[in-house]
Amino acid sequence: MDYIKRFTTREGVRMSLAVTTDTVETARVRHDLWPVATAALGRAMTGAILLAGDFKNHENVSLRIKGDGPLGVVHVDAFSDNTVRGYVDEPHVDVPLKHAGKLDVGAAVGHNGEVQVTRFTQLAQDYTSTSPIQSGEVAEDLAYYLYASEQVPSTISLGVLVDPDYHTVVAGGFIVQALPDATDEALAQVEKNINELGPVTEYLKVHPDGKGLMERVLDGLTVNEVYNEPVNFQCRCGRDRFAGALMTLREDDKKAILEDETTELVCHYCNEKYHFSREELQDMFEPKGPVQ
């Protein structure tokens, strides 16, 4: 089962860790993603889940990665209940592999563009901030965003492994952040641990449940687990929402769609299809008099 865990340490370092294999696979199936699209969207979904709740507040986060690569825009919404949804503009993209047969997410996303993050919090006004894309590999781009926009030094590792049949083998990642009281010794120790760990997907291949990953990253520090909750793909769409959207159409547009026997609407985020018959729409669009 997918999850997110958060840890604090006595030495002033904190860590958020997520395993998202099933969540990413759900997105792959719903959107019929090709491998590099799965990797890009999976990294972005994992990163957004890690961003969606800090250690004090849980909030909704909207992440848009707008690169100049063939994938188009990567769209992700992560919610305070640890659910996430997302899509890419072009799910059927193929780019040449990098060395050792690695997926070239940077080429698919693009090396130029911007990362846009909107935080929806109950404690303050919603706000949006942007930062330039650094590599298109997602993790480096989010780390730069946190430093440039929120002044939080962070190390982020995100990974998605896809097999030759396009299925998601493992997916997950972590964020490690230094608090103002972090000691130089602790930061040096964590940097050493992360360098020795290598790519997070290599670890998850051996330990798909992520067990022991925190111990590897925070080895040598005094750790306290403060949060442990499940993660899953879930959309906020629904038939009632689409019906409400149809009601906002101009009269000319309403007449136009009534020319068809059935109207199909598709949610971008989850690819769910909603069908409305002509009779349903006629009833919906018919002016309703005041209740007597």
Task: Map each language-model feature to its residues.
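Interaction interfaces in information-processing and related assembly proteins
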Residues: 1-227
